[in-house]
Structures are given as C-alpha cells and as structure tokens.
Amino acid sequence: MFNILESESRMSEQENTITDECNIAFIVALKNAMNVINGKWKLAIVATMIKQPRRFNDIERLLQGITPRMISKELKELELNSVVMKIESIDPETGKKMAMYDLTESGRKLEGLMVQMATWGQMHRDDS
C-alpha cells in the first residue's frame, strides 16, 4: 500500500528525486481517489451531507444550478463507490416511501480533504 509519509521522507533523502515504484504507487492512489470524486457536482453533493442526511429535494434546493437528472446520476455513482448510502423508510406523516442519502464511513473521511481543498481554492483565487 502507498504511504505518502514514507514517500515524502524518501523524496527528501533523495534530493527530491522519486523512484519509479513510488511515483507509480502515488499516481495509482491519486487516480483511484479521482475516479471516485471526479465530476462537477460530486464533492458538492457530498458536502450537503456533512452535517446530516439529506433528501433528494434538499440536495436540489441547496445546489442551485444542478438538474435532477445530474443529482440522480451522481448519487448513483457515489453509492456504487460506497461514498453515499440510500436509506429508504416510510414517512410517518404521509405513509409514503421516502429516501434519505447519507455518507458512509468512507464518505465521512472526505470532509477533511474537502476543507483542505476549499482552503487551497480560496488561497489560489486570492493569489491569482
């Protein structure tokens, strides 16, 4: 398994040169992550669920400019990648089926990454 701390240590020891094995492991791990979160709306959808589970309509309301079709597509992909889970239940008021979406344990681990990305994004924009 790729260990970024080991590779950083190795890079400084080798005067910022990196071995082919480490470079490949890093790139594979990065591509794995990007395959899961890549897309215009995926991280925004995940962000809506950081504090609490959300209904489909909540996500649509919170993310102005996204179509219902795109929400559905992105949620399905996030479910397939075990980032989001769909929780179906019966609405006690109406007796109708309802669905909520919540983050899995793996999805919750994205919060720190998203905070770092948002911080970097703001600094990058301010520096430009």
Could you tell me what each predicted segment is?
Residues 85, 100-101:
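Short, solvent-exposed charged binding patches
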Residues 54, 76, 80, 112-115:
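Generic structural signal for well-ordered, non-membrane alpha-helices
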Residues 25-70, 76, 90-100:
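N-terminal helix-turn-helix DNA-binding core of bacterial DNA-binding proteins
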Residues 2-18, 47, 102-128:
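Amphipathic alpha-helical dimerization/coiled-coil segments
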